Amino acid sequence: MQTSPLLTQLMEALRCLPGVGPKSAQRMAFTLLQRDRSGGMRLAQALTRAMSEIGHCADCRTFTEQEVCNICSNPRRQENGQICVVESPADIYAIEQTGQYSGRYFVLMGHLSPLDGIGPDDIGLDRLEQRLEAESITEVILATNPTVEGEATANYIAELCAQYGVDASRIAHGVPVGGELEMVDGTTLSHSLAGRHKITF
């Protein structure tokens, strides 16, 4: 079946989104055209502005339309001297939602992966090293993902911190709240056992 070239182009464009295959893209395209053209126009305008105006924070490398993001420019976020290292800007949103962290961040935009040719400079570790040297940082919290690459990246950064006399800590990994032990994989259970703590009364 031959469809409109513009419709085909729209469906192909929608497929750039994660988890969106041909059928999902087709459904989205038809929904926008049939039922929500005003929503489609708002989406197009928001995408155009975001793609052209959003860049990276000069300090932490997260997404922002300013030179320095709101977190990095907030004096209160600098008081405790903590920097939390994450792989993605999305990780910042996840941590901020907990309300348990009041320091600053550094976004790697990935992780070390020698097999893929991704080295320290490719994920901004040269910039992180500059901050370790120039700023009054007391602790680096390593919140990379609990994958082989994430662990390797965390270990590399921990060694970097040691060179500058900065404490490095790793976020805990373990059994999720509400989870059942028989459903937890061996690696997660091993981390849980290794990271156990005393119960005091």
Curated annotation (Swiss-Prot):
Record keywords, A-Z: DNA damage, DNA recombination, DNA repair, Metal-binding, Zinc, Zinc-finger
Residue ranges of every copy of the Toprim domain listed in the record: 81-176
GO terms of biological process kind: DNA recombination; DNA repair
Pfam families: RecR_C, RecR_HhH, RecR_ZnF, Toprim_4
Zinc finger (C4-type) in chain: 57-72
Domain of life the protein comes from: Bacteria
GO MF entry, a single one: zinc ion binding
Cross-referenced SMART domains: TOPRIM
InterPro entries in the cross-refs: DNA_Rcmb_RecR, Rcmb_RecR, Rcmb_RecR_Znf, TOPRIM_dom, TOPRIM_RecR
Biological function: May play a role in DNA repair. It seems to be involved in an RecBC-independent recombinational process of DNA repair. It may act with RecF and RecO.
Family per similarity comment: Belongs to the RecR family.
Record-given protein name: Recombination protein RecR
Gene responsible for this protein: recR
